[in-house]
Amino acid sequence: MLTQRQKKILQAIVRQYTSTGQPVGSKHLAEKLPFKVSSATVRNEMAVLEDNDLILKEHSSSGRIPSKRGYRYYVDNLLDPQAVTDNDLVVIQNSLGNGFQKIDEIISHSADILSNLTSYTAFTLKPEQESVRLSGFRVVPLGNHKVIAILVTDSGEVENQSFTLPPDIDTDAMQAVIRMINDQLVGLPLSEVVKRLKDDIPLQVLHYMHSPDGFLDIFDNVLSQAARERFFVGGRLNLLDFASTHDPHAIQSLYGLLDKNDNLSNILDSTLTSDNGVNVKIGQEISKNKLLDDYSLITASYNVEQYGRGIIAVLGPTRMPYSRTIGIVNAFRQELAKRLLDFYRHYYDS
């Protein structure tokens, strides 16, 4: 259990180090503390913090820096989120006020805005797809057994992919199956459509075709595109600014983490349950991947009422200014939720 003075000293060390990037010495710290204390006393208290693995001594300096455990203690017990500045709030509101035509445009642009505000790598995930329903599915022949499959949702999203049909598929039978799919599945949530596609729909297709596999694979592929979680990344190169290694293979692997949805899904915990919707992970708490040992991840959910919940996140060095960054993330999620709610209401009311 730390004393109040030890807590204040640890808080000051974290704030000083995240601001300057330089190890903090006892003499300088004594001058910055909000109470009068000698540098010898500060030195003794820092020794206690070091014994508790909350701060570390760097070999090249007599000063101390926070440890991962020290950052964790600071975030959990000593953090005082900084209110977003008026200037940053205006930037957020103006950037989200542009004339967007699709939800994905807003979410993608949001990642860039958040990255620019923090100078770190930012992630955004569109609201969950629970409320999105199938509006229609059709297949347009292109000739030579090639078709384009088109799926439309009630949120205005349109997914299309080109395919080559198996030569044994009868086009009349295919159109009959498409009518059956629209008759039975239009109006259902995409999650229910996915379930039906695995359960009873294949059996019904057998009334029209010898095997459901060839054609249903097409529908399944387009449906998967519409139902997938969509992460957008802003400021990819910012991640490399704080890399602790100059090994080109390690840097390539670090950059590659951002290229696959599976990686991002594992890194971004999409099951946030905290009431305030903000979560901070430090070092190995983020991932078992050692490339992220010197990074921290601030994740926040945003709620768009009945239209679902999405996620925004910032990935930066463990020595990021947590108070300011959390303040920006918190303000951003609120403004993004407002903007998306306006968009959804406009779409459904029009």
UniProtKB/Swiss-Prot annotation:
Keyword Transcription regulation appears in the UniProt entry: yes
GO molecular function terms listed in the Swiss-Prot or TrEMBL record: DNA binding
Superkingdom: Bacteria
Gene Ontology biological-process annotations: negative regulation of DNA-templated transcription
Coiled coil: none
Keyword list, A-Z: Repressor, Stress response, Transcription, Transcription regulation
Classification via PANTHER family: HEAT-INDUCIBLE TRANSCRIPTION REPRESSOR HRCA
Record family assignment: Belongs to the HrcA family.
HAMAP family: HrcA (MF_00081)
Purpose: Negative regulator of class I heat shock genes (grpE-dnaK-dnaJ and groELS operons). Prevents heat-shock induction of these operons.
Protein name: Heat-inducible transcription repressor HrcA
Source organism of this protein record: Limosilactobacillus reuteri (strain DSM 20016)
